[in-house]
Amino acid sequence: MKVVYTDDALRDLLDIADWLADHYPAVAPAVERRIRRLVARIARWPLVARRVVDRPDIRVAPLGHYPYKIFYRVRDDRIEILHIHHAARQPRTPEN
């Protein structure tokens, strides 16, 4: 299934990359690879991740042993990556 990133998700990726480059440059490539792999898995099996309790149209997939979560929505013909957040942060509310 086709994957599209919202502007918010693209900003999240840039923020994550910048922060990791400043604080943990050795880890940054591994996190980037893990994000790409998880997005590819979501594209293959879009319904496998759990739904967000108060937003059943949105799903959330954890990034394994890295503290990030990918929030996404499944549409008829595509998957929209809405946000990518550090698990300790309160996610923004995605717009409809």
Predicted regions located by residue number:
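Basic, Lys/Arg-enriched alpha-helical interface segments
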Residues: 2-60, 75-78, 94-96
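Enriched for short, Lys/Arg-rich terminal
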Residues: 63-69, 73-96
